[in-house]
Design a protein with these regions (language model features):
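Core catalytic DNA strand-manipulation module of type IA topoisomerases
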Residues: 1-168
């Protein structure tokens, strides 16, 4: 699944470890005497979000991150289908965006917090503005035109979704 691939590349978690941790986050973690499911069903590669989730995400972005990070319209990824995707369910996301990874860290193991942070930030960033870069290219050619060297680089101008979903 996409979750397993992303957890492997970003966190170094194996597929079964990822799913065991996700299962626990889905079934519930005890927070202040109450067992709370922190993520939606995790055995899916679905990309659609419920209207309520989108509304909650957009309100959170506007109020907690900044209006400049909020696209004019909600972003929809339902047309993008992964090969062999299991899409009967909504995309994996936090059940309540207000439960930030930092706010519930003390209730989670280190690995649970890492995976929850990945799910939380990836889901929320899906409704944020794109990052903006300036791309520069320099070409140097020798006097006799025998040798040409080209170098390109990008400079981040606006962090957009990268503000919370770091590209590590």
């Amino acid at each position: 699944s996409t979750l397993q691939q992303t957890a492997s590349s970003r966190l170094g978690f194996g597929a079964s470890r990822t799913m065991q941790i996700a299962q626990k986050l889905y079934q519930g973690i005890e927070i202040e005497g109450e067992t709370i499911g922190l993520i939606t069903y995790m055995r899916t590669d679905g990309t659609n979000l419920s209207k309520d989730a989108i509304s909650d995400f957009r309100n959170y972005i506007k109020n907690e991150i900044g209006n400049e990070y909020l696209p004019e319209n909600a972003l929809n990824y339902s047309g993008k289908k992964a090969k062999n995707a299991q899409e009967a369910h909504e995309a994996i996301r936090p059940t309540d965006i207000i439960r930030t990874p930092q706010s519930i860290k003390k209730y989670l193991s280190t690995d649970q917090n890492k995976l929850y942070d990945l799910i939380w930030s990836r889901a929320l960033s899906s409704q944020m503005e794109s990052a903006k870069f300036d791309r520069n290219t320099i070409t140097i050619t020798s006097d006799n035109s025998d040798t040409t060297c080209k170098a390109s680089g990008s400079v981040l101008k606006f962090d957009g979704f990268l503000k919370i979903y770091k590209n590590t």
